[in-house]
Amino acid sequence: SDVLKKKNVFALSVNGDSMIDACIAHGDMVLMEPVSDSYSLRNGTIVSALVPGLGTTLKYFVKKGDKVYLEAANQNYDPIVLDSNQLIIQGRLLAVWRKV
């Protein structure tokens, strides 16, 4: 698969249901491509982000001015709103693996 040919791809285990409406469920494995420059991200990209006090989270990335909104795919979760310099975007979603 082309996904596995990309450099520095990493995997994360999903913990929780914040992205369930994007068909990403608790226990899934997500393959992520490292992001070196968050300015290259388009709004609506699913990213893993390191958020102070929360750890790593998987959310939709939305940038508005100097603010970044990390939005869940589950209406039970409020967006996480931060200044763009308050978080580290670790990677963008490439694929979801689920055991059946």
Model-identified regions with their sequence ranges:
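Acidic/glycine-rich C-terminal interaction modules and beta/coil loop segments
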Residues: 2-100
